[in-house]
Amino acid sequence: MQPEGAEKGKSFKQRLVLKSSLAKETLSEFLGTFILIVLGCGCVAQAILSRGRFGGVITINVGFSMAVAMAIYVAGGVSGGHINPAVSLAMCLFGRMKWFKLPFYVGAQFLGAFVGAATVFGIYYDGLMSFAGGKLLIVGENATAHIFATYPAPYLSLANAFADQVVATMILLIIVFAIFDSRNLGAPRGLEPIAIGLLIIVIASSLGLNSGCAMNPARDLSPRLFTALAGWGFEVFRAGNNFWWIPVVGPLVGAVIGGLIYVLVIEIHHPEPDSVFKTEQSEDKPEKYELSVIM
């Protein structure tokens, strides 16, 4: 017989446990996206505020990519660790996730990114205030707005910027589909987040020059909104010839195109697995971690 205190503790724990699968998945997406932004934008903040002494392009590319991997490790077993509205949209379109979940996933992702940006702002508040004499600037050598959101290179047109985001996210989704395709080479179970992190390093290193390679509406729009409210002002939405919508719409289009390409060029041509193979797959890989459910 357990002590009375232990029984009370157990009852309290039981009261905390969520019964709704959707609620669990929503919280998972919130936490995963929060971690992505804190670690990812934290890498950018360290590089910018130290004026390159404690980071640069390499640390930002690697750090942000590993932030994605760590976020997927946190959320992957519960919600799949989409941490990206573009990914969630593609999964619904291609039957990997039910449509009614989409607004919950997307809302959690945007909220997690906003809270993550606020956390980075709080951690580096003194550094931000001393960096440009207390000014929060969007352009110039003392600009700090790009710690939180992406901005285009001076030469970049809106048409080129849109194509940039479509293509980058298209490639992201093609390879993510491949990583989780059990009938392709795939990745060893448990190493999928690392594979995705390496993928983002490659994309950021090859396609990041134009505008920073956001590929994620929540990662860009929520921190941008935070900066508008935190002191940079709503000029963050007008900067770059009203660039703000490009990292929102471009990834959504690119994700759909990328998923469609993989399905049409690779997935539908796989031979149907026999019943033994199906049984082995169901035993080796729980449904919650399959591409059809999480990615």
Swiss-Prot record:
Gene3D superfamilies in the cross-refs: Glycerol uptake facilitator protein
Query: Where do the TM regions start and end?
Result: 25-43, 58-77, 99-123, 161-178, 191-207, 244-264
Q: Which residues lie within the membrane without crossing it?
A: 80-92, 211-225
Q: Which InterPro entries match?
A: Aquaporin-like, Aquaporin_9, MIP, MIP/Aquaporin, MIP_CS
MF term (GO), any:
urea transmembrane transporter activity
Topological relation to the membrane, as annotated: Multi-pass membrane protein
| BP terms from Gene Ontology | amine transport; cellular response to cAMP; detoxification of arsenic-containing substance; glycerol transmembrane transport; purine nucleobase transport; pyrimidine nucleobase transport; urea transmembrane transport; water transport
Q: Which reaction does it catalyse?
A: glycerol(in) = glycerol(out); H2O(in) = H2O(out); urea(in) = urea(out); (S)-lactate(in) = (S)-lactate(out)
Sequence motif NPA 1, residues? 84-86
Q: Where is this motif: NPA 2?
A: 216-218
One GO cellular component term noted in the UniProt record for this chain = plasma membrane
Q: What does this protein do?
A: Aquaglyceroporins form homotetrameric transmembrane channels, with each monomer independently mediating glycerol and water transport across the plasma membrane along their osmotic gradient. AQP9 is the primary route for glycerol uptake in hepatocytes, supporting hepatic gluconeogenesis. It exhibits broad specificity and may transport various small, non-charged solutes, including carbamides, polyols, purines, and pyrimidines. AQP9 may also facilitate hepatic urea extrusion.
Q: Which family is this sequence assigned to?
A: Belongs to the MIP/aquaporin (TC 1.A.8) family.
Comment on protein domains: Aquaporins contain two tandem repeats each containing three membrane-spanning domains and a pore-forming loop with the signature motif Asn-Pro-Ala (NPA).
Protein's name in the database: Aquaporin-9
Organism listed in the record? Homo sapiens (Human)
Q: Which gene encodes it?
A: AQP9
